Amino acid sequence: MEGQNKSITFDGREIRLTTGLYAPQASGSVMIECGDTSLLVTATKTTKKEASDFLPLICDYEEKLYAAGRIPGGFMRREGRPPERATLISRLIDRPMRPLFPTWMRDEIQIVASCLSLDERVPADVLAVTGASIATLLGEIPFYGPMAAVRVGLIGDDFILNPSYREIEKGDLDIVVAGSPDGIVMIEAGANQLSEQDTIEAIDFGYEAVTELIKSQEDLLKDLGIKQIKPSDPEEDKTLPSYLEKNCSKAIDLVLKKFDQSKEERDLELEKIKTETQSKIDSLKDDNEVRVLTSENEKLIHSDFKKLTKKLMRSQIINDGKRVDGRELDEVRKITASAGILPKRVHGSALFQRGLTQVLSTTTLGTPSDAQEMDDLNPSTEKTYLHHYNFPPYSVGETRPMRTPGRREIGHGALAERAIIPVLPGKETFPYVLRVVSEVLSSNGSTSMGSVCGSTLSLLDAGVPLKAPVGGTAMGLIKEGKDVRILTDIQGIEDFLGDMDFKVAGTNKGITALQMDMKITGLPVSIISDAIKKARPARLHILEKMQEAIDKPQESLSPHAPRLLSFRIDPELIGTVIGPGGRTIKGITERTNTKIDIEDGGIVTIASHDGAAAEEAQKIIEGLTRKVHEGEIFSGVVTRIIPIGAFVEILPGKEGMVHISQLSEARVERVEDVVRQGDEVTVRVREIDSRGRINLTLRGVGQNNGMSYPEPTPTPVAPLN
């Protein structure tokens, strides 16, 4: 078997492409490699069997643990349902690919990116996105590409192209920019309160690199003798569109100009116009061309009516500067917010509403053992902040079965999660695991940004000391030729009929998250820059409204939330605290009715609903880890008697033995003649043997019964910060 190999030098690295060797029955396939990261990306097109009114595109990213030399956990030792990371990368591929296929295409297209080997220095996601474009081009599928994606990081004052996982963690920015020859088609970003100007410069920096990869793909096609199939729009039958424009335009335009009506009223009126039009068509003669067309395809009137509505709404915005609800282009809908709306058995809660979009967010405080373990190819092993987003059917007035979260819900949850992470307190000052759940109670656009706002409010209500509140809004776009209008705080119909959905979240200082999706084949950086700048005053307005509901963390936690104590011990003494088979730590938890977690670095977290119990457990652990020195004197309690001596607890959880010969200056026949179990005695540390056992003596030590334990002094270690 022989394939064709090509190397691309990009940012000082070699990207290796192998074509014509793998997956020969796919329409197009490429093995794309950089460092030790290898992905097989395939694109397959089949003829659609049933008529539909959308592009049936499926993008799947799959990762197998063998790519990192690991065997899956669980009884079956086999990968099961795709992890959240795989779902998010699948969306990352889909979002820039979808607008680059012609709107009229109805053939089934599936893109599969399989991670076969993973190098932690080379994240696989952006390679998968670029590989999807290459596989589609090689498969000679109509496509407005090439398309490529890069990641941009920021360390200090320097932008870094395609940083490693470690560099991403250290930096203040993680942004993925995808683009086509026409401009940028997708942005996904998380940032540490980055200024608008720095964010714009990062996007510009990323798109410059994207153009290099686009040129490399064009060169690859030339080298292989493959001619790209540029989509050519089929001739459209104007019969039905002309009929609808003549008979419906005036009525639709009147509905769109009723600025004081509700969404439900507008939808009902538009549906009424469509139904009446359908009845008129049905009454036409059997040989009428319009009736023949609609009888052959029942969905045709629906799609053409939607196109006409879209055209009229866009014209109203472009020409009149008015939106369907009467707002100015830069106007935010009415906002209401409240915190603490649920009983305190829920640790934190809030309700955020913007227009008809309403989100209920709740916060739960958990212990370190509640962290989510990550069984995927992500180098991070656990998550301590979780955001779950739910979108029930009643939120849009529909009925359908309630299923597990879909890709959209996972993606929106991840976006809101990313927006909040930069302002969370460090685990040293607030060691709780946090779970926020956002329930979308009503949806009319920008529910993910509503979830960001609701998350902030519920976290503050739970007493979480955020560095700053985070708010967000969705920006939209209407572009007709050179006429461009940017919309602030888009609602559902503007998202559905517009060209862009650009979500911007952040604090009053800067941006924490971005997500931009397009319905056109690309936008220049200048227009994206305008959208980012116009999002700032809207965000500040939203933050001001949020702070009217709650402007600082609650001073006390819910009485039903666990109490945590966190401190550090010498990592070398972790084994002492755990004990053989976990007996020691189990004994402490049972004695104090607490929950104890110890990290590899020596950070101990004690959870309890009783603060005194947590303090008792801390005292025991500090006693266990306190180093005892020869010559020290302790007041302790006799815990056990054996024929050759007595065991004395000198510190909580730490015992030493007094040999029978060390009980008195005089000869002792029986241990019980001098001490009994439960006696308080004063002892001196005689020696600590090579095995760490503490030998004590009563000889030469004046007894002072009733003396309490000395305050334990923890072993000196590095401070938490």
Swiss-Prot record:
Ranges that cross the membrane: none
Group of enzyme by EC: transferase
Gene Ontology cellular-component annotations: cytosol
S1 motif domain mapped to chain residues: 631-699
Keywords: Cytoplasm, Magnesium, Metal-binding, Nucleotidyltransferase, RNA-binding, Transferase
Keyword Cytoplasm: yes
Reaction(s) catalysed by this chain's protein: RNA(n+1) + phosphate = RNA(n) + a ribonucleoside 5'-diphosphate
UniProt KW Magnesium keyword: yes
Cofactor: Mg(2+)
UniProt-listed SUPFAM superfamilies: Eukaryotic type KH-domain (KH-domain type I), Nucleic acid-binding proteins, Ribonuclease PH domain 2-like, Ribosomal protein S5 domain 2-like
Binding of Mg(2+), residues: 495, 501
GO biological process: mRNA catabolic process; RNA processing
Residues covered by region (Disordered): 701-721
EC number: 2.7.7.8
Subcellular location: Cytoplasm
Ranges of biased composition (kind: Pro residues): 711-721
SMART domains tied to this protein: KH, S1
Domain KH: 562-621
GO molecular function terms attached to this record: 3'-5'-RNA exonuclease activity; magnesium ion binding; polyribonucleotide nucleotidyltransferase activity; RNA binding
Stated role: Involved in mRNA degradation. Catalyzes the phosphorolysis of single-stranded polyribonucleotides processively in the 3'- to 5'-direction.
Family assignment from sequence similarity: Belongs to the polyribonucleotide nucleotidyltransferase family.
PANTHER family: POLYRIBONUCLEOTIDE NUCLEOTIDYLTRANSFERASE, POLYRIBONUCLEOTIDE NUCLEOTIDYLTRANSFERASE 1, MITOCHONDRIAL
Name by which UniProt lists this protein: Polyribonucleotide nucleotidyltransferase
Species of the source: Prochlorococcus marinus (strain MIT 9215)
